[in-house]
Swiss-Prot record:
Topology of the protein relative to the lipid bilayer: Multi-pass membrane protein
The protein, known as: Inclusion membrane protein A
Regions crossing the membrane: 41-61, 64-84
Protein keywords: Coiled coil, Host membrane, Membrane, Secreted, Transmembrane, Transmembrane helix, Virulence
Role according to the record: Chlamydia replicate within a host intracellular vacuole, termed an inclusion. IncA is probably involved in the homotypic fusion of inclusions.
Main location: secreted
Similarity field: Belongs to the IncA family.
One of the record's GO cellular component terms: pathogen-containing vacuole membrane
């Protein structure tokens, strides 16, 4: 029997700091638009009532007052539409920021589990040659996890640098896929934490090491499947971003062609006149 070794408990995850991923404060122009939208919400009832009265008696008394009231009513509706457009984009950005924070917390928890499994692999290496081979397999599997999450971090950095494209490109289906991936990863972590405690207990009992090795191999296969799914998800996200960029460039070229075509058609008509 090997001497039991003390395992240091992992540190608690750091409190999420929102200094780096802070939601941008609205500018002066956004505040002015918000105030204008609120004012239009207050005035829309009175203006609508006055517009109805203007339709009834305006053409008999003063048609100019009717035209002014209708213009004010249309202006208030345009301000409300602009305010709703601004707030919808901001809510979508805040939802994406929350998903990014949850992915970072999961990355930290996986790094803590990586340290725990590395320590357990060193303990198993002292018991038998078979356990040393299993610890090497775990180490390679965890290295694959690290490489995969490095790719995720680089992808998240790219999303931060292109926030405007994220607001346009990301749809509710992609956000739902991210939420499902986060939920599956949390379930895996909840399953791995009690399993680590069970492995520590089984380290002192050589008769049950074979069963523990089989369980660890099955978990290793499931982790590899999760890595493949995450890699496939990152590929689909990258392909969707490239496709949306190509479509936006094609749309810009079509707009330029449509803007230039009226000028070309107008120039021969001026020459003939």
């Amino acid at each position: 029997m090997t001497t039991p070794t003390l395992i240091v408990t992992p540190p608690s995850p750091p409190a999420p700091s929102y200094s780096a991923n802070r939601v941008p404060q609205p500018s002066l122009m956004d505040k002015i638009k918000k105030i204008a939208a609120i004012a239009s919400l207050i005035l829309i009832g009175t203006i609508g009532f006055l517009a109805l009265l203007g339709h009834l008696v305006g053409f008999l008394i003063a048609p100019q007052i009717t035209i002014v009231l209708l213009a004010l009513f249309i202006t208030s509706l345009a301000g409300n539409a602009l305010y709703l457009q601004k707030t919808a984009n901001l809510h979508l950005y805040q939802d994406l920021q929350r998903e990014v924070g949850s992915l970072k917390e999961i990355n930290f928890m996986l790094s803590v589990l990586q340290k725990e499994f590395l320590h357990l692999s060193k303990e198993f290496a002292t018991t038998s040659k078979d356990l040393s081979a299993v610890s090497q397999d775990f180490y390679s599997c965890l290295q694959g996890f690290r490489d995969n999450y490095k790719g995720f971090e680089s992808l998240l950095d790219e999303y931060k640098n292109s926030t405007e494209e994220m607001r346009k490109l990301f749809s509710q289906e992609i956000i739902a896929d991210l939420k499902s991936s986060v939920a599956s990863l949390r379930e895996e972590i909840r399953f791995l934490t009690p399993l680590a405690e069970e492995v520590r207990r089984l380290a002192h009992n050589r008769e049950s090491l074979t069963a523990a090795i089989e369980e660890l191999k099955t978990i290793r296969d499931s982790l590899r499947d999760e890595i493949g799914q995450l890699s496939q998800l990152s590929r689909t996200l990258t392909s969707q971003i490239a496709l949306q960029r190509k479509e936006s460039s094609d749309l810009c070229s079509q707009i330029r062609e449509t803007l230039s075509s009226p000028r070309k058609s107008a120039s021969p008509s001026t020459k003939s006149s």
